[in-house]
A protein has these predicted regions:
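Tryptophan-centric aromatic hotspots in well-structured domains and transmembrane helices
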Residues: 1, 26-31, 64-65, 122-125
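Active/binding-pocket-proximal capping segment
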Residues: 15-19, 24-32, 72-73, 103-107, ...
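Catalytic-site neighborhood detector that most strongly recognizes the C-terminal catalytic loop/helix
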Residues: 147-186, 191
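Alpha-helix N-cap/helix-start motif at helix boundaries, enriched for small hydrophobics
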Residues: 7-12, 143
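Active-site/catalytic core of tyrosine-dependent DNA strand-transfer enzymes
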Residues: 37, 49, 54-117
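Short, basic (Lys/Arg/His-rich) helix/loop patches that form interaction surfaces
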Residues: 2, 76, 93-145, 149-152
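Conserved tyrosine-mediated DNA breakage-rejoining catalytic core shared by Y-recombinases
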Residues: 11-62
Length: 191
């Protein structure tokens, strides 16, 4: 529902999920994807990867914010909650937090659910979001912003600010609607 890269998801810190003011002073829950000097294992693919991704309502309905609040309430020895990742149990290996998740997804999850094909892997979820938005007529520059794709315009990528979260939410995120897009009845077989 976000179109984020697997490593972007796996390397999220608790404080990367936050409310950000939109156009009308309303706050919107977002993933703040950024490279942070004090977190050297957190790397972005390119300059366009640095972005704010509004959180889809389905993820909110599934209790993501309650999960964040729970993580914030836990006492961590010698560390504040801000220094913890959302998925702290994922080890860093081969330059990524996503390596083991990718292996598990491709070698265990997909075969167990009879979804294994040569063309399906975790990255297929990004392609699904991209294609879904394209088929809904969303302009490519909005899709690129949501997905963190480079546009080829280095000036915009390096010096330009990203769209306001409300714009990306309205142009993209709220248009990500699958037939069973609800917190209790998601059918992943079509992915």
């Amino acid at each position: 529902f976000s179109g984020m890269r697997l490593n972007e998801i796996c390397s999220l810190y608790i404080d990367n999920v936050r409310e950000i003011s939109g156009n009308h002073r309303e706050k919107r829950w977002c993933f703040d994807i950024l490279e942070e000097l004090n977190r050297p294992q957190k790397k972005l693919k390119n300059l366009a990867s640095r972005r704010v991704v509004p959180i889809h309502q389905t993820l909110l309905d599934l209790g993501l914010i309650d999960f964040i609040k729970l993580l914030k309430s836990v006492k961590y020895p010698n560390r504040e909650w801000k220094e913890k990742r959302l998925f702290e149990e994922l080890p860093f290996g081969e330059g990524s937090f996503a390596r083991n998740v990718c292996r598990w997804w491709n070698s265990r999850y997909l075969p167990k659910h009879d979804l294994k094909t040569p063309k399906k892997n975790f990255h297929s979820l990004r392609h699904t979001v991209s294609n879904h938005l394209k088929q809904k007529g969303v302009e490519p520059h909005f899709i690129n912003e949501l997905l963190g794709h480079a546009t080829g315009n280095i000036d915009l990528e390096r010096y330009g600010k990203g769209y306001n979260p409300d714009i990306i939410f309205n142009k993209c995120v709220k248009k990500i609607v699958y037939e069973t897009s609800n917190a209790r009845g998601i059918d992943f077989k079509s992915l």
